[in-house]
């Protein structure tokens, strides 16, 4: 059972997924900080001091903090756009590498050339037999 677990846990896909999750979480924190600490204050300056996080309505001690919800949606949109751009650049780079691999078709070996000639001769013989 332990060996099966080791095979599963240390497969390339599982390790890649784990690394992706950790990097994604860190990336999410960076983008959230960018939105919270830089973009939102800049928007506040442009729009006349608007702070989304303080927007709320309520009755008595109860409050609905819809400003936090707006801020979270804004964070999500920025994170989604950032990840989209990252994936787009990554796909473009990997597709270039694949195109280079496809272009690098090795020249046929001497044996392959001889086999091609033999094939062509056999085709000629078969076509001449069909005519006769």
UniProtKB/Swiss-Prot annotation:
Membrane-traversing stretches: 14-34, 38-58, 67-87
Membrane topology label: Multi-pass membrane protein
Keyword Ion transport set for record: yes
Keywords from the UniProt entry: Cell membrane, Ion channel, Ion transport, Membrane, Transmembrane, Transmembrane helix, Transport
Source taxon at top rank: Bacteria
GO cellular component, one term: plasma membrane
Subcellular location: Cell membrane
The UniProt record lists the keyword rRNA processing: no
Entry GO MF terms: mechanosensitive monoatomic ion channel activity
Gene Ontology process terms (BP): monoatomic ion transport
Subunit structure as annotated in this protein's UniProt entry: Homopentamer.
Protein purpose: Channel that opens in response to stretch forces in the membrane lipid bilayer. May participate in the regulation of osmotic pressure changes within the cell.
Family statement drawn from the similarity comment of this UniProt entry: Belongs to the MscL family.
Protein name, UniProt field: Large-conductance mechanosensitive channel
């Amino acid at each position: 059972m332990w060996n099966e677990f080791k095979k599963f846990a240390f497969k390339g896909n599982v390790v890649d997924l784990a690394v992706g999750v950790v990097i994604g979480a860190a990336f999410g924190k960076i983008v959230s900080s960018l939105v919270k600490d830089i973009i939102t204050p800049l928007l506040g300056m442009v729009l006349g001091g608007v702070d989304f996080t303080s927007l709320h309505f309520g009755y008595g001690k109860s409050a609905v903090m819809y400003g936090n919800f707006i801020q979270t949606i804004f964070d999500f949109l920025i994170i989604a756009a950032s990840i989209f751009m990252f994936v787009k650049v990554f796909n473009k780079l990997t597709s270039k590498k694949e195109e280079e691999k496809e272009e690098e078709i090795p020249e046929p070996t001497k044996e392959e050339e001889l086999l091609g000639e033999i094939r062509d001769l056999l085709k000629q013989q078969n076509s001449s037999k069909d005519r006769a």
